Amino acid sequence: MSFRSRFIHLHVHSDYSLLDGAAKISDIISKAKKCNMSHIALTDHGNLFGAIKFYKEAKKAGIKPIIGIEAYMAKTSKFLKKQDDLGKMSYHLILLAKNELGYKNLLKLTSISYLEGFYYRPRIDKDDLEKYSEGLICTSACIGGLIPRLILANRFEDAKNEILWFKKVFGNDFYLELQRHGIKDQDIVNERLVKYSRELGVPLTAANDSHYVNREDATAQDIIVCIGTGAKKSDENRLKMETNEFYIKSQEEMCELFNDLPEALENTVRIAEKCDDFKITFPGPILPDYQIPVEFNTLGEYLEHLTLEGLKFRYKNLTSKIKDRAFYELSVIIGMGFEGYFLIVWDFIKFAHDNDIPVGAGRGSGAGSIVAYALRITDIDPLKYNLLFERFLNPERISMPDFDIDFCFEGRDEIIKYVTNKYGEDKVAQIITFGTLKPKAVVKDVARVLDIPFAESNELTKFIPDGPKVSLKEVLDDNSLKECFTSKPVYKELMNAALVLEGMNRHASTHAAGIVISKTPLTDYVPLYKDYKQGSVSTQYTMDLLEECGLVKMDFLGLKTLTLIKNAENLIRSVNPDFKIKNIPDNDVKTFNMLGEGRSASVFQFESEGMQQILKDAKPDSIEDLIALNALYRPGPMQFIPQFIAAKKGVKRIKYPHPDLKEVLRPTYGVIVYQEQVMEVAKIIGGFSLGKADILRRAMGKKKEDEMNEMKVDFLRGAIEKGYDKEIASEIFELLKPFSGYGFNKSHAAAYSLIAYQTAYLKANYPEYFMAANLTNEINNNDKLSYYIEESKAIGINVLKPDINRSFREFRVTDSGISYGLNGIKNLGGIVVDLIIDEREKNGKYSSFEDFIRRVDDKVINKKFLESAIKSGLFDSLDQNRKTLFENLDHLIEVVSEDKNNKKLGQNSLFGALESQDPIQQSFNYQTFKEYSYSELLGFEKELLGFYVSGHPLDPYKKAIDSFSSLNVLTDLAAKKDSIVQFSGILNSVKVIQTKRNNAKMAFGVIEDFKGAIDIVVFTESYERYRNFLLEGNVIGVVGRLTFNRDKFSIVVEKVVNIERLSEYKINNIHIKFLNNKLNDLQLLNSLKESISNFEDNSGFSNVYFYLRENGKDLKLKMNSILNFVPDEDKLDKLRKCVIVEDVWVD
C-alpha cells in the first residue's frame, strides 16, 4: 500500500487463542483493510496455529502480515512446576518476527514452550529468550506481563531491573506496551511505564489487545470464554473481560485514545516498518536422506533393483506387459524425483513385514502402482484388476505421491516408533487438527452458557440440517425459522452469539493418521505442539500446510480388521498349521454363496443391513463384483445399483455407449462405476493420454466448467481424429460428467474389497475361529462384544461363560464352542490374568475354589478381584455355586491366610526343617446357600462382562422386539440419522430431571436390545404421557427421531409402547395432497389439522405428510409429531371430504 498508517495493531488474538479469542482470521484481515491499515499482527496465546493462514490471507488482501505470539514466560526457570514469589506460574510477553530469522526463532520458542516448559500453559524462560532473540521485536504485553505485575505489586525496582534485562537482550527492539481499556490497573501500570520509558530510554508502544473484531462481538467473546471454562453467563466471579473495549479499533479511535502520547502511536508504525522485509519461504516437500547400500550409485538404481526383485516374488512369469508397466512407472517416479519417497515407504513397510505386523492391501490410489505392488507397499495386482498408475502419480500434473497405509491396529505404534528411531525424534511428529464450533454444537454450547434448558436447545437444533456446508446464516434466511429462533429475547442473544462463533476453533487434537518426516529438525520448518493427555508431539500447522513448509507427509492408519485377520490366522493354525490368508483362493464358492444369501454381518465393508439386502439381490460371484458393489454403495452412485443388478442377472440387456467401450465397462455390466473408467473412456474415445484423462476427471469431479469446456474441445478434436462421429463423442463426453462426480476410486475399492473377501472367506470356512477373533478384537467394547455373541449364536456357535480351567486371556475355540477371554472381565487386570493362567499351566487345573485361593499369590489377587470373578461365573465349573462362594469368601480368605502364615512360621522355627514341605491342609467347610435367582445371575454378567452370556432378560420378548424394532444400533445409526425409528429393549437406566425454566420434568435414559444400547431423551410432553412406563428394568418400545449431538446418537422419544403391545404396532404413513387454489383459506387448513389431531385414540402410530405446490415448486411437509391412531376407512373418508383436499392415500 502506498499510504502510511498512523497506527498499527500489534496485539491481536484470533480464534486460534482457543476458547479465548473470538475473531476469525478472515474477519481480522477484512477489518484491517476496512480501517486502511498497511500492516497487522497476529499474536495468539503461546502458539502459531494460525500463522500461515494469516500470512497468506493478509498477503492476498494487500496487507503486510506481522507474525507473532503472546508468549507465556516463567519468571525464573520453565522447569520449575510451582508458583513464583508473585503467586504466578507465567507472564505474558509479545514477540514479533522482524524477518525470516525472527520467524525461525519463533518456531523454536513456541516449540520449546510446549515440549519443555508446559505447566498449565506452554512456557519459555529467559534462557530461551537470550538464545533465540535475534530477529524478534519484544513488547511488555498486557497487565498479565511480568513488568506490569511487578508494578501492581509495588516492586518498582524489580520492575526497572526487568526492563533493563529486556533492553539488554532485545536492544532497540524492546518496547513498553500501553493499553487503555478502561481498567483501573492499566492506568496504574501505564503511569509507571511512561515514567520508566523516559528514565531508562525504552520506547513506548500503544496496543488494544483485541480478542474480537467489533465492539458488538464482546458478548460472543464472553460466551466463548464461558464455553472454555464451563461457566454460565449468570455466574458471579467467573473469568471475563472487564470492559467491551477489546476489539480491533480504527486508527481514528486509537489516535483519540492515545492523543496525549503520539510517540506511542508512531512507534506502532515504526515497529511494523521494521517487519517490512519479513517473508516466509515455502520450499515444498524436502525428502529426508535415505541411505542406500554402497553397491548402488543412485536412489533410482536401488529402487529399480528392489522393483525387479519384487516382481520375481509377485509373478511366476515376468511377461513383457508386466516389465513394460514397471519400467514405465519407474521412469515417471525417477523423472519426477520421487524415488526417495518410494524407498522411505518401502523401508517401513519392510519393517512391518519383517516383524509380523499386518499391512493393508492398499488404500487410495496407490494400489494402482505395480512398483508399489512389487515393493509390497500394496497387496493387490493392478494388472489383474485394471488399476491405473496415473490415478496415483500423474506425470502431467506435478504433485507429491501420497501413500495412505493401513497397519494392524496393535502394530501401528511400533511402526511410528521405528520411523522415529530411524530418522530421529526431532524429525518425526504427528499432525494437529482442530475441532470447530459447528452449527448444532454452537447452538447447544451457547444455550448452556445462557442457561437455556437442554430440551429447548435440542428443539432448536432440530431445525438445523446436517451436512458440512450448512450454516446458521442460511437457516435464518428462512423467515419461518428465523421467527422461531428469535421468538424470545434469550433466543435472539443465543443466535447473535452463535452466528459470530460458528466455525471458530474449539480445541486442538491429534490427526488420527498423519505423520510427518523432515530432512533436518522439524523446528527448522514448523512449530511443534504437545498433547499432554495423549503424550504425542504434533505439528502446530494442519495437514494441508505441511508439504509446502518442507515436510513429507505419510498417513499411518490403524485398521482393526487387519488385527482381526491376524488373530483369526493364529487361531486357525492350531488346526491347520499351514494356513495363510494370502494363499486363499479368490473364487471360493462357499464364500460367495454365503454373501449371496446376505449373511455378511461382521464382514468388513459389507456388514450393514442395507448392504446385506444388496448382496442378496446381486448374488456376487467374483471379487470384481464385490469391488463394484463396494463402490456403488454410497450416496450418489447408489441410484445405479438396480441397473447394475438387473444387467448382471440378465434381466436387462447391457448397453454400452459405444462398442469400443465394451472392455472397459464389461466388469460393471455397462455402468460407469469408477473414476478409472472415466479416464479409460477419455483415452479410447478422445485420444487423451491417461495423464490428461486424469486432469479431465479432476475437472469434472470438481465441476470446473471453464476447464471442462476447454477439454471438451480437445476431446472432440481427438475423437474426430480417431474416426468417431462428433455427435456421438459429444454425447459420451456429457455422459461422463455426472459419473466423474459419482465415480469411486477403483484402486481403493479394490484394495478394501480384497480385505472384505478375506473376512468373508474366514467367516464362511472357519466361522468359530473368525468369531473368536472378532470377540478378542473388541474385548474392551461391550456393545461390539454383545453384537458378536448374538451373531455367533445366530450362526450356531456357542459362546461359553468364563471358566477358571478353560479360559485364556483371549477368546479361543474349543470343542464346545468359544471359550470366554479373561481379559474381558471387569476388575481382572492383565497381570492377574497372566498369573492365573501361568499357575494353571505349570501345576495343573484348579480342583476347587479353595485350591485356587491357596495356589495364587494373595499379594496380587485381592478381595475385589475375587468378588468380581465369582459374580462373573468364573468358578461355576468348580464345587460351589456363586452365592455360597460369595457368602463364604471372607472366612475362606481368613482361613487360608492363617494356614499360609502358620506354614511360614513353621519353616522358620527350630524344628521347621523336620516338618513336611507340603503339610496336610484341612478342607474348608462351606456354609451352603441357595443360588442367586436367574435375573440376579444375569445382572452380575451384565455388571462384570458388560453384557449377558448365559441368557438375556429379553429372551421371552425376542419375537415381539424383532418385529417392532427398525434400528440396528451397530450398523444403522449413520444411515438412519434424523429419521423416525422404532426401537425396543430393556431400560437400563432412567434419570428424571426438573427443568429450570418451568419446573417441568423430562427424562434421560439408556435402552438396550440384543445388539446394543442407545440413549433416549424424553421431553416434558412425552414424559408426562408415558412416565409410568419409564421405569428402570421395564421392557418397552420407543418411537422417535434418531439424532446426533455432541458426538453421540440418541432417540428423542415421541411415543412409548408397553411390551405387551409391541407386536400390534406399526407406523402408518398418511399422504394428503392439497388443492392448491384452496390453500389460502387458513380457517379450513387449521380445521383439517384439528380434525387429524382429534383422530388420536392410541390404536397405533401414524405419520402425516402434506403435498402442495408453492412458487412453482412441489413441496412435501410433515406434521411435527407422530400421531396415536390407525387410519381406518372412516377416518380416511373424513379427510377426503375436506374441500381443500385433492387426494389421500396410505402406505
Curated annotation (Swiss-Prot):
Tell me any Pfam family this protein matches.
HHH_6
Enzyme Commission number: 2.7.7.7
**CDD domains, per the entry:** DnaE_OBF, PHP_PolIIIA_DnaE3
* EC class name: transferase
Gene Ontology MF term list: 3'-5' exonuclease activity; DNA-directed DNA polymerase activity; nucleic acid binding
Cellular component GO terms, alphabetical: cytoplasm
Keyword annotations of the record: Cytoplasm, DNA replication, DNA-directed DNA polymerase, Nucleotidyltransferase, Transferase
One GO biological-process annotation of the entry reads: DNA replication
Q: Which InterPro entries match?
A: DNA_pol3_alpha_NTPase_dom, DNA_pol3_alpha_thumb_dom, DNA_pol3_finger, DnaE2/DnaE/PolC, DNAPol_HHH, NA-bd_OB_tRNA, PHP_dom, Pol/His_phosphatase_N
Outline the subunit composition. Answer: DNA polymerase III contains a core (composed of alpha, epsilon and theta chains) that associates with a tau subunit. This core dimerizes to form the PolIII' complex. PolIII' associates with the gamma complex (composed of gamma, delta, delta', psi and chi chains) and with the beta chain to form the complete DNA polymerase III complex.
Q: What does this protein do?
A: DNA polymerase III is a complex, multichain enzyme responsible for most of the replicative synthesis in bacteria. This DNA polymerase also exhibits 3' to 5' exonuclease activity. The alpha chain is the DNA polymerase.
**Entry's family note:** Belongs to the DNA polymerase type-C family. DnaE subfamily.
This chain belongs to the protein called DNA polymerase III subunit alpha
- Encoding gene (name): dnaE
